[in-house]
C-alpha cells in the first residue's frame, strides 16, 4: 500500500471516515454516506471476512495519517516492542509525528497540507528548522511557524479558524505568536478516532 495522492474526499467515502478531519469533507460524507462509483450504494450486502475487516482497519489508520505500508508497519513493530498497551503506544507514536502535531496545532488545515508545510521548511522545533514530516516530537518541544512564513495566506486563514476551534488537550497553543508546545502524550480517550486498533494488532499478528 503506497501513499494515496488522489482526492481525499473520494478516499474518505471509500473508507467510510473523514480522513481529512475537516468540516468540508464531513459535510460531503453526510450528503453521500456511501463509497464512490456506480456500485457504491450497494456495498456492504455481503458479510466481509475477518481478514478483510482487519485489513480495512489498518488501511484506514495508515491513510488517516498519510503513511505508506513500510513506514506504518515499522512504527507498529516499534510500538509492539516496548512496554505498555500496544494499540495506545502505536497511536501515541503516530500522534508524535511532526506533520501531525502541526495539524493538531492548527498551523495546517489537513495532515496532507501539514506534510507539505513541514517539507518546505516552514516549521521550527525548539527554534531550529526541521523539514522531516516523520520527525518525532518529544514532550515539552516547542513547535513554531518560521517568521518569514507567518504572512502566507493559508497560514493566516488557518490561525484565524483555529481561534474558533477547541485545541487538542495534549498541546498548548499561542495563536498570536504562531507557536505551541507538545505538553503530554495523548491518552486513548483523548483521541476521537473511528478506529479499532485491536483489529490492526490482530492483522499484523496473523
Curated annotation (Swiss-Prot):
PROSITE patterns: RIBOSOMAL_S4, S4
Keywords annotated in UniProt: Ribonucleoprotein, Ribosomal protein, RNA-binding, rRNA-binding
GO biological process: ribosomal small subunit biogenesis; translation
CDD domains cross-referenced by the UniProt entry: S4 (cd00165)
Superkingdom field: Bacteria
Family annotation (Pfam families): Ribosomal_S4, S4
GO molecular function: rRNA binding; structural constituent of ribosome
Stored SMART domains: Ribosomal_S4 (SM01390), S4 (SM00363)
Chain residue ranges for the region called Disordered: 29-52
Keyword check for GTP-binding: no
Family stated for the protein in its record: Belongs to the universal ribosomal protein uS4 family.
HAMAP family per record: Ribosomal_uS4_B
Subunit structure: Part of the 30S ribosomal subunit. Contacts protein S5. The interaction surface between S4 and S5 is involved in control of translational fidelity.
Physiological role: One of the primary rRNA binding proteins, it binds directly to 16S rRNA where it nucleates assembly of the body of the 30S subunit. With S5 and S12 plays an important role in translational accuracy.
The protein's name in its UniProt record: Small ribosomal subunit protein uS4
Organism per entry: Deinococcus deserti (strain DSM 17065 / CIP 109153 / LMG 22923 / VCD115)
Species lineage: Bacteria, Thermotogati, Deinococcota, Deinococci, Deinococcales
